[in-house]
Amino acid sequence: GCASRCKAKCAGRRCKGWASASFRGRCYCKCFRC
């Protein structure tokens, strides 16, 4: 789902934190402490 894709994306960028939200069928992802 959205959260797992976001987590994998941020992990790939070596970010320590991440946050995701689904809105109107779209996945929004934000990576922190990269």
UniProtKB/Swiss-Prot annotation:
UniProt keywords, alphabetically: Antibiotic, Antimicrobial, Antiviral defense, Antiviral protein, Disulfide bond, Immunity, Innate immunity, Secreted
Domain of life assignment: Eukaryota
Any single biological process term in GO: defense response to bacterium
Gene Ontology CC terms, in alphabetical order: extracellular region
Signal peptide bounds: none
Disulfide partners: C2-C27, C6-C29, C10-C31, C15-C34
Subcellular location: Secreted
Function summary: Has antibacterial activity against A.viridans, B.megaterium, M.luteus, E.faecalis, S.aureus and E.coli. It is active against the marine species A.carrageenovora, P.alginovora and C.drobachiensis.
Protein's name in the database: Mytilin-A
Organism, scientific name: Mytilus edulis
